[in-house]
Amino acid sequence: AEIDHIALSRWADIILVMPTTANFMSKLSIGRAEDLATTVLLASDKDVLLVPAMNVRMWLHKATQSNLKILQDFGYLFIGPEKGEMACGEFGEGKMSSPRQIFAYLKNYFDKRDIVKERNFKALVTAGPTREYIDPIRYISNESSGKQGFEIDY
């Protein structure tokens, strides 16, 4: 039987993490593999594109900037963040790059490698709320609508 995170790490041509939070960057920078996403990334030898999105103060924090440098040294690819109005209503660097910018980046990535021309292009897009189980019955969740994921899948 195949192990899920190993099979997924072999399946992808590139792995896109969008949005990439400060917490997720921190986990990657120390090699923490505690869930499907982080175990796939640690098991993969493919390029990984991270798309940071967070409050400007979180982005500029020394810990986040240190994690950014570590991840760049590991070979992770980055697009953004951009300057603009963020979800919290503040303005500054930390806004996620637009889906169009990310699509253009990926198109260029694949064009340079002739990946899409070799076979049918498939993408896995996940969207919606996340759940972190405290125990078998209770969990902490968010109210994500999945709108961002549905926009990507146009």
Regions inferred by a protein language model and the residue ranges of each:
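A cross-family phosphate/adenosyl-ligand binding-site feature
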Residues: 1-48, 56-146, 150-154
